[in-house]
A protein has these predicted regions:
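Conserved active-site-proximal phosphate/metal-binding subdomains
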Residues: 5, 129-143, 149-205
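Active-site entrance/lid segments in N-terminal catalytic domains of soluble metabolic enzymes
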Residues: 1-141
Length: 205
């Protein structure tokens, strides 16, 4: 999300996240500062570690006083000391029990157990299968993600051992999301069989 949506989620009682994606560090810095103008509540930044700007973005979040960093597409261990010294809570996205355990050993404050229902490149394990196994394997809090769209999904995640949920696609059609109206309408009108999974042939579904 960009700063409008991240701030709106935080204002509504959640923890909004700015998606750094593959954006340059100064773009991320500007997004953080713009979000601070819209909310005085905590928000976080998601850093895609395969980004060519990851090293610079890692420094920016520390400099700007971001409260939470979530990470994906890479190993955040080399940034842990920097972020911990800045008082940042680090929450990596994981798609397996083995990675969850490794992140716990590395000092993660929590993990996002993200199943294949999520709208991103992740493993083949479903959310319902992954979350309880991760919850049993680590002592840090587990956040469930992938296919959760309402209170029923959240309640199910809690029963599986999660302590929170992460949602992304659920907010695509919100007025704060910087997405073309045609795309929003396609999401709203989509039925249960309309999802298409890409990337299987490259090993990144």
């Amino acid at each position: 999300a960009e700063h409008h949506l991240a701030a709106a989620v935080s204002e509504a009682g959640g923890l909004g996240l700015i998606g750094a994606s593959a954006a340059p560090a100064e773009w991320v810095r500007n997004e953080i500062r713009e979000a601070k103008k819209l909310t005085d509540k905590p928000f976080g930044v998601n850093i895609m570690l395969m980004s060519p700007y990851a090293d610079e973005v890692a420094k920016v979040v520390a400099e700007e006083g971001v409260k939470v960093v979530t990470t994906g597409a890479g190993n955040p261990e080399k940034y842990m000391e920097l972020w911990k010294n800045a008082g940042i809570r680090v929450i990596p996205v994981v798609a397996s029990v083995a990675l969850a355990r490794r992140m716990e050993r590395a000092g993660a404050d929590a993990v996002v157990a993200e199943g294949c229902e999520s709208g991103g490149h992740i493993g083949e394990t479903t959310t319902m299968a992954l979350v309880p196994q991760v919850a049993d394997a680590v002592k840090i809090p587990v956040i469930a993600a992938g296919g959760i769209a309402d209170g029923r999904g959240m309640a199910a995640a809690f029963m599986l051992g999660a302590e929170a949920v992460q949602m992304g696609t659920r907010f695509v059609a919100s007025k704060e999301a910087v997405v073309h109206e045609n795309y929003k309408q396609l999401v709203i009108k989509a039925k249960d069989i309309d999802t298409r999974v890409t990337g299987r042939t490259t090993g990144h579904p």
